[in-house]
């Protein structure tokens, strides 16, 4: 497919509006109430050159259908039938179109991951039964939700599955996901094609299409909007000919599947077809090396990448106690200390007698991903535990490890393949520990061959050449180094070693470990598993990166050691964590502001209680809580923190407010409140993700928020404002079809004798549109706080 073009359709919503879609009407129900209209629209697109039409099933999910007399299956089957009717006599095919569920998944929201998978599976089952030719998952902004939809599609069908996500002007999705993280995660999970749709026009998205074509081997899809909407009339500003002209550059970048999204119609698809028909997609310079990620943190394995070893109960009594007690906050503290010290990947091992690893490993993974954004390496040989953890992991993880025994390969590699993980191959087999480098290399080759047979690319196989204790097997150190050299230089693979094993049983272990580490890195060790809290070890890594050319212009080295102040700060930090945390007192977070910023609910509550011994409740709010939230908000605006961090800080702030409320109640005092705000998603719009985020953040700045919900009539908003004497109202709209409802709500509020200030936001709202209505423009939750401060103080 990369060598020929495939033409998709344009917007369904745009066409339905043209044909009189009423405000508040559910578009998906037209499959039952007016199927001929849908067939006519599909046929217009086919006549314009479309080869694959998207059935009118974008929002046909359980959540949206629950207030209608129809089931998901009723709507999906009718929509696909209408599309298939349009294809009669042509070669066009029908895609089951699956959009977002309209609710944030845990931990950012309240929707459990498996519930989301089940909701998507219901749509997939209906689409398969109705005869869909392929599945197109689109307009996703949360990589976790895209994963849930893709898993449902792969587990409930054998149809091809395409996935597109929506990226904004920052080059990230609404939740902070990057292009490489999206590409490698979805590719690993088995998507057949990936791309971008909606959010912006082709000119704005062109750099992102170019980036995507460089980082994935899959066919790339482009379905951009017809430019940007006019703030007054909602019409998109890019004519069909200009749209098509820019799409020539998109195809030139290597995109092979093209269509349009919001604002496009058959005229756009016809112009697109005329402009690029007969073109061959541009040659793609694909860089596809070893890679791990979380949504916000892509990590290419090029050069040395440090794996932190401390999340492991072996020999750590306090850690063992935490596991047995289910004290995940302690484990998070251990993780934070390692990341702060420079770990780029965290090894996660929870295997201990009395611990249910199948239940505990996914719990720890979820907890860690709430707080740290580095990729995880799941350390277990328990296939059930690994599957449970990989299923809930958001991004591309590594599995540590599989050995060369055939049974282990047959058991673990299918799990690795299904979830698109990388895997550490341990160079031993049923015969035991190999004595020579040649034997280890031979096992490594068998592991790679087996992985490739299961469809795991060789760049996703990392080889552990085994570090044995030098005090007991002195000759084995050289064999290990020789194996590392061959595996990395001759086989071209990433290499792993548990470095600290070398010094077990010796005095001055640090010196021996550090020396062996440097020798191993020089031979080709790229993924050392070490204790990053040991300053001398990390200093050795920093120096090696300079000498190997990885640290260009010595920039990181100079930053680490370039000033006396930096050296003093580093020594102070190292003294605090040089031995792994053994008690809560050694936790990484020791002040309230830091706990809020990091989103640590339990630590924030504990530190708030301690602070109340010397400060009053108002002081906690003004000196700690608000400055901490402001810091996260500023980082969010600068693009160095993202939605997960913003919501994590808000949740930690909620924990602090609970402590403050309890303290005031015990004294008989009044709650800390800064003013009341009404918020609502306007009539006809059932999307409330953005509104809910705004509510959470406002509440944690001390504002009392009355949330009227979604699909709220103007009269309901006005009644609440009058009854509660509200001075600030927040309105949200996600769809252009509901902008008239927003305008009407604002108009009615302005007619009140003492009208409130109004702030508006949502994906389709612009600053000009807000100004024309006489409202503040709140581009995000952070902006809503600044408006509230201006209006209410």
Regions found by a protein language model. Name each.
Residues 1-793:
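Domain-level signal for soluble alpha/beta catalytic cores
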């Amino acid at each position: 497919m990369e060598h020929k073009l495939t033409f998709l359709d344009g917007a369904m919503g745009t066409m339905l509006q043209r044909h009189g879609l009423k405000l508040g009407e559910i578009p998906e129900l037209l499959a039952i109430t007016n199927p001929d209209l849908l067939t006519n629209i599909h046929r217009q697109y086919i006549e314009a050159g479309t080869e694959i039409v998207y059935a009118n099933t974008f929002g046909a999910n359980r959540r949206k259908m629950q207030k209608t007399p129809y089931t998901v299956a009723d709507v999906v089957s009718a929509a696909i039938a209408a599309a298939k009717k349009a294809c009669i006599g042509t070669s066009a095919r029908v895609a089951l179109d699956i959009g977002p569920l309209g609710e944030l998944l845990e931990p950012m929201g309240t929707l459990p991951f498996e519930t989301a998978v089940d909701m998507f599976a219901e749509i997939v089952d209906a689409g398969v039964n109705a005869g869909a030719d392929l599945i197109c998952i689109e307009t996703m902004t949360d990589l976790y939700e895209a994963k849930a939809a893709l898993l449902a599609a792969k587990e409930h069908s054998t149809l091809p599955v395409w996935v597109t996500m929506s990226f904004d002007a920052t080059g990230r999705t609404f939740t902070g996901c990057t292009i490489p993280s999206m590409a490698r995660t979805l590719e690993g999970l088995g998507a057949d094609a990936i791309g971008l749709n909606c959010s912006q026009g082709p000119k704005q998205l062109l750099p992102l299409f170019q980036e995507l074509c460089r980082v994935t081997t899959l066919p790339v899809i482009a379905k951009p909007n017809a430019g940007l909407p006019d703030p007054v009339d909602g019409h998109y500003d890019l004519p069909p000919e200009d749209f098509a002209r820019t799409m020539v550059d998109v195809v030139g970048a290597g995109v092979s599947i093209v269509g349009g999204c919001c604002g496009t119609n058959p005229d756009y698809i016809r112009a697109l077809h005329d402009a690029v028909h007969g073109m061959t997609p541009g040659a793609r310079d694909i860089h596809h090396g070893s890679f791990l990620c979380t949504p916000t943190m892509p990590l290419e394995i090029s050069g040395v990448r440090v794996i932190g070893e401390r999340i492991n109960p072996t020999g750590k009594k306090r850690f063992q106690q935490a596991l047995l007690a289910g004290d995940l906050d302690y484990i998070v503290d251990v993780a934070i200390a390692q990341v702060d010290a420079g770990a780029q990947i965290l090894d996660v091992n929870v295997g201990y007698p009395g611990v249910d690893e199948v239940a505990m490993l996914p719990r720890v993974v979820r907890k860690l991903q709430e707080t740290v954004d580095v990729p995880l390496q799941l350390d277990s040989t328990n296939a059930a535990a690994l599957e449970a953890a990989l299923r809930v992991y958001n991004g591309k993880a590594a599995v540590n490890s599989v050995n060369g025994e055939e049974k282990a390969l047959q058991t673990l590699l299918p799990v690795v393949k299904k979830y698109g993980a990388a895997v550490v191959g341990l160079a031993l087999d049923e015969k035991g520990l190999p004595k020579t480098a040649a034997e280890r290399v031979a096992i490594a080759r068998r592991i790679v061959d087996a992985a490739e047979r299961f469809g795991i690319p060789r760049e996703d196989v990392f080889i552990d050449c085994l570090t044995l204790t030098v005090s007991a097997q002195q000759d084995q150190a050289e064999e290990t180094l020789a194996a590392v050299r061959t595996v990395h230089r001759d086989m071209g693979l990433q290499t792993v070693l548990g470095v600290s094993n070398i010094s077990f049983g010796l005095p001055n272990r640090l010196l021996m470990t550090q020396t062996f580490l440097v020798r191993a890195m020089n031979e080709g060790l790229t993924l050392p598993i070490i204790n990053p809290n040991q300053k001398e070890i990390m200093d050795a890594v920093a120096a090696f990166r300079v000498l190997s050319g990885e640290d260009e212009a010595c920039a990181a080295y100079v930053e680490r050691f370039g000033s006396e102040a930096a050296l003093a700060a580093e020594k102070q930090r190292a003294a605090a964590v040089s031995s792994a945390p053994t008690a809560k007192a050694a936790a990484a977070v020791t002040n309230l502001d830091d706990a809020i910023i990091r989103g640590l609910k339990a630590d924030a509550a504990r530190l708030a209680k301690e602070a109340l011994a010397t400060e009053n409740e108002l002081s906690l709010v003004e000196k700690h809580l608000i400055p901490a939230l402001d810091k996260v908000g500023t980082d969010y605006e600068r693009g160095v923190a993202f939605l997960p961090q913003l919501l994590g800080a808000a949740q930690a702030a909620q924990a602090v407010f609970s402590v403050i409320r309890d303290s005031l109640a015990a004294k008989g005092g009044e709650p800390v409140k800064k003013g009341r705000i009404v918020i609502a998603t306007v009539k006809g719009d059932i999307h409330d993700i953005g509104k809910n985020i705004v509510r959470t953040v406002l509440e944690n700045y001390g504002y009392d928020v009355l949330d009227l919900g979604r699909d709220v009539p103007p009269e309901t908003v006005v009644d609440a404002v009058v009854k509660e004497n509200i001075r600030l109202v927040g309105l949200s709209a996600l769809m252009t079809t509901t902008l008239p409802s927003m305008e009407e709500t604002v108009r009615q509020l302005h007619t009140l004798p003492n009208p409130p200030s109004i702030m508006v936001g949502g994906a389709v709202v612009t600053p000009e549109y807000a100004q024309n209505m006489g409202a503040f423009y709140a581009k995000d939750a952070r902006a809503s706080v600044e408006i509230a401060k201006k209006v209410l103080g």
